[in-house]
C-alpha cells in the first residue's frame, strides 16, 4: 500500500519555539524621594529601562509624575481623601528627587460633601508664588444653617454668593503670593486657607467644609538643583555614606593543595 502524505499532520516549524525573555531583566528599580515638607520621605519605587547606548535611564525618569495619597505621605489616615502629585526633577544614584506638582480630592470625598438644602460655592484663581511658580487654585465651600435657625434649608442669595466668591479669591491670592511653593504646600496640608475663608465669610453667610480642592501647576521656573536640594532639606546626608575598609585587615592566601601528590 502506497504511503501518501497526510496533510492533516502539521509539520513542526524550523528552529523551534523562541524562549520569551524576562522584560524585568533589563530594568532597574529607583527609590522615589518626597520633599521634606512631608513626614515620609521614601514613598515608593519606580521602574525604568537600563541605560543602553544613547538612551539614558535618568532621562527617562525625569518629569515622570507620581500620584500619592497624603495619608501615605503624612502617616495619617485622616488625610486619605487628598491626592498629591509629585514630579521627578532629578536623579541622584538610585534616588529620584521629586517636587510638588499638584493636588486633588478623591471622587468619593467630593461626592460626600454635596448634599441637599445647601448652596455649593466654587471659585478659582491663578496665582504666582515668590519663587515664580504659577498655580491655579480651586476652592469649594458649602453654606450651613445658623445656630438659631428653624428653617430646614440654608440657601444663599446670588449677591451673597458673589461676595463670598470675591472673598475666596482675595484670600487665595494673598496667601499664595506672599510665600514660596514649599511654604504654600505647608498651608495646604492642615487646610489653613480653607479655615481662614470660613472665618472671613462668616459675616456674609456661615460656611462649612471649605477646602482648596484642587491645585494645578501651570508654569514652573527654570530647573535649579540648589533650590531642589533646599526643598529636600537634609536629604544629602543619606544619599551615600563613604565606607572605609579597615587598614589592619590583610588577606592571607592559602597555599594551593596538590591533589594526588
Swiss-Prot record:
Compartments where located: Cytoplasm
UniProtKB keywords: Cytoplasm, Ribonucleoprotein, Ribosomal protein
One annotated Gene Ontology cellular component of this protein: cytosolic small ribosomal subunit
Keyword Ion transport: no
GO MF annotations in UniProt: structural constituent of ribosome
Chief localization: cytoplasm
GO terms (BP aspect): translation
Region of interest: Disordered: 1-22
Keyword Ribosomal protein found: yes
Residue stretches of biased makeup (Basic residues): 1-18
Superkingdom assignment: Eukaryota
UniProt record similarity statement: Belongs to the eukaryotic ribosomal protein eS1 family.
The protein's assembly and partners: Component of the small ribosomal subunit. Mature ribosomes consist of a small (40S) and a large (60S) subunit. The 40S subunit contains about 33 different proteins and 1 molecule of RNA (18S). The 60S subunit contains about 49 different proteins and 3 molecules of RNA (25S, 5.8S and 5S).
HAMAP family per UniProt: Ribosomal_eS1_euk
Protein name, entry field: Small ribosomal subunit protein eS1
Classification of source organism: Eukaryota, Viridiplantae, Streptophyta, Embryophyta, Tracheophyta
